[in-house]
Design a protein with these regions (language model features):
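Conserved C-terminal C-lobe helix
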Residues: 104-120
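Conserved end of the kinase activation segment
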Residues: 54-64
Length: 143
């Protein structure tokens, strides 16, 4: 909405207080005004566990769809189960891989929404956070 892109957002930026049921976003120190172009190639900011494909390729646009990928990957971290080997492969292959549906803890509908968010093909992802949020809420309306 404000024209900024998060360039270093990951699970370490989120704190949850179980006693108050409050989630806090913290340590968000690197936002850039769009348009943002990856000028570092594979050394672009962020953890390999959650990075979108364009965050490895010099000259690619880093935008809202990139941030949607990161959020989708975070959602998989929270609600998916991964073996140590699967996590290791993300680092070796420079590629986030979602868990399989049997290793997903929420509904199949929410799995489909999260899977679209982390599509390797940027044109297949949600275009906006508003679209992603709408689909996520619809898929999780029973919770």
């Amino acid at each position: 909405q404000k024209g900024y892109v998060a360039v270093d957002f990951y699970d370490g930026s989120i704190m949850y207080d179980f006693s108050t049921d409050v989630t806090t976003i913290c340590d968000i120190d690197l936002f850039k005004k769009a348009p943002v172009i990856n000028d570092k190639g594979v050394d672009w900011f962020g953890t390999k566990r959650l990075k979108a494909p364009e965050e490895y390729m010099e000259g690619c646009a880093i935008d809202e769809q990139t941030n949607i990928f990161t959020l989708g990957a975070l959602i998989f971290e929270f609600f998916g189960r991964f073996s140590d080997e699967e996590i290791h492969q993300r680092y070796c292959n420079n590629q986030f891989i979602p868990c399989t549906l049997p290793n997903w803890q929420l509904s199949e509908e929410s799995y489909q929404v999260a899977t679209k968010a982390v599509s390797l093909n940027k044109s297949e992802r949600y275009l906006t956070f508003a679209e992603f949020w709408y689909e996520w809420k619809a898929a999780n309306s029973n919770f």
